[in-house]
């Protein structure tokens, strides 16, 4: 059991050393902005459609009950 724990500690230490030399990941800011604009336009379209539906329901003639 102790050999297994020592092996895991060794593997973790080696992975930390090897990862420290890797270049930091770059965040694609332009892609995030593009997606944000698309989502914003979609939400705006949903809001406009909802408003148009509310206006239509307000103006359409109501059915009379007998």
UniProtKB/Swiss-Prot annotation:
Protein origin, superkingdom: Eukaryota
Gene designation: MOR2
Naturally occurring in which organism (per UniProt): Bombyx mori
GO biological process, one term: innate immune response
Annotated signal peptide: 1-24
Subcellular localization(s) per the UniProt record: Secreted
Family to which the UniProt record says this protein belongs: Belongs to the moricin family.
Induction: By bacterial infection.
Cited function: Has antibacterial activity against Gram-positive and Gram-negative bacteria. Probably acts by disturbing membrane functions with its amphipathic structure.
Protein name (Swiss-Prot/TrEMBL): Moricin-2
Tissue: Expressed in fat body and to a lesser extent in hemocyte and Malpighian tubules.
């Amino acid at each position: 059991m102790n050999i297994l724990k020592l092996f895991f500690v060794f593997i973790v230490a080696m992975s930390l050393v090897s990862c420290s030399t890797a270049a930091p990941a770059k965040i694609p800011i332009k892609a995030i902005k593009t997606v944000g604009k698309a989502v914003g336009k979609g939400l705006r379209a949903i809001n406009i459609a909802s408003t148009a539906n509310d206006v239509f329901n307000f103006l359409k003639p109501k059915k009379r009950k007998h």
